[in-house]
Amino acid sequence: MEFWFTEKQTERFGITMKIKRTLHTEKTDFQQLDMVETEEFGNMLLLDGMVMTTEKDEFVYHEMVTHVPLFTHPNPKHVLVVGGGDGGAIREILKHPSVEKATLVDIDGKVIEYSKTYLPTIACALEDERVDVKVADGFMHIAQSANEYDVIMVDSTEPVGPAAKLFERGFYEGISKALKEDGIFVAQTDNPWFHQELVSNVYKDVKEIFPITRLYTANIPTYPSGMWTFTIGSKKHDPLAVEATRFHDVQTKYYTPDIHRAAFVLPKFVQDLLK
């Protein structure tokens, strides 16, 4: 008997994948967690029935949420990841030699635990001595931080359940306070096909807080529509004004200096969402 998984991404649209086997399933204190092995995308993490990451295409998301802000900042030393319990963002952050400390704050320790077990190529850097892993509420962690981080990345789930407050204006105001005077933050902000209001509202909220605010995109096959947005807010450094000499060699599969620049070239319908 064949086993197929379908993520219903809207009421009329979804993505379906053939499953080899279920690796782990558990109702944590915060969400339904499933690890499955797929035929096409390798091992896959699902939270509340939604695809979070897969072994085959994870590099796109993790490279784009990290390298864009890290190359924009001239000397990032202390970096915070809110969410991101799979460890992929941490893996990419540590490719930057200037980084002295990377802090990861995820509310659900089970995501961290089972990512280490079933997604070892993604979670491979979580034991690095430069990494401080905290199982805690990212919203509260931000509220208790001030002038501490060079770069903050919000690697959250969809805006439902415990992650909903990570898409609110008050959270972005807290991030601004938690950043140093030339700090940068980036958040994944869903897709512009099915969640246009979210993309628009987050961008406008961030723009009212950060003097430099931009939106960029990446192509991620297993995410809704395959087109994903990231909103970046910066106090001083413009991601479109990065000097060519700042780009150093990092081992990537998607991100390049050309991709860095091209990601900010938006289709007209996405530009219109930001007006």
UniProtKB/Swiss-Prot annotation:
Pathway(s) it belongs to: Amine and polyamine biosynthesis; spermidine biosynthesis; spermidine from putrescine: step 1/1
InterPro entries: PABS, PABS_CS, SAM-dependent_MTases_sf, Spermi_synthase, Spermidine_synt_N, Spermidine_synt_N_sf
Gene3D superfamilies: Spermidine synthase, tetramerisation domain, Vaccinia Virus protein VP39
Location within or outside the cell: Cytoplasm
Enzyme class label: transferase
List of catalytic residues: D155
Swiss-Prot/TrEMBL catalytic activity: S-adenosyl 3-(methylsulfanyl)propylamine + putrescine = S-methyl-5'-thioadenosine + spermidine + H(+)
Residue numbers binding spermidine: H62, D86, D155, S156, T157, E158
Domain PABS, residue spans: 2-235
Record's keyword terms, sorted: Cytoplasm, Polyamine biosynthesis, Spermidine biosynthesis, Transferase
GO terms, molecular function: spermidine synthase activity
One record GO biological process: spermidine biosynthetic process
Superkingdom to which the source organism belongs: Bacteria
Pfam family, one: Spermine_synt_N
Main function: Catalyzes the irreversible transfer of a propylamine group from the amino donor S-adenosylmethioninamine (decarboxy-AdoMet) to putrescine (1,4-diaminobutane) to yield spermidine.
NCBIfam families found in the cross-reference section: MFS_SpdSyn, PRK00811.1, speE
Subunit and partners: Homodimer or homotetramer.
The protein's name in its UniProt record: Polyamine aminopropyltransferase
